Amino acid sequence: MKKIIFEAIGNLIFVLLFAAVIIEVFVTNVKYTTDGTQFTTGTISSIFLIYLIVFLISRLVLSKKDKSYSLKQGEFSAADEREKNNAYFASIVSYKSTIISLFIALGIFVFINNLLNPPFDIELNLFVSGVVLFTLVICIGFLSYAIAWVFQDTR
């Protein structure tokens, strides 16, 4: 169960930092000049690179300490038949929750500009809204996998 929680938390942090880097680079730090487009990176990009290195090293250390953890398979690593069944159950739950979340996010994304602009006069950046919505969908997928795996394991 430790490897599932480790992977879920690690992947969640990875996705959230990656989304923050995308927003930082393409929205807040882009400059359009006559010479072309110029991108600069900031502190979030540095934090992301440091986290990526630390997470990869942590995964490598875990694969050396826990023989049932495969670096290539990650959270799908299984020591026995019970863990394979848990992974299968969690994959089904994760798939269903991700698909439902995608439909909800698509609905929000399509109607967000029309719903908020006229009554509230709020100008939203659709790129940022899209990145945030799809990041949330991915996080829901990771969380639902971890919760379903732990639920199945403790049942």
PLM features: what roles do these ranges have?
Residues 20-25, 44-45, 94-116:
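Alpha-helical transmembrane segments and their membrane-interface junctions
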Residues 53-73:
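Membrane-water interface of transmembrane alpha-helices
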Residues 1-53, 125, 133:
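Long, highly hydrophobic alpha-helical transmembrane signal-anchor segments
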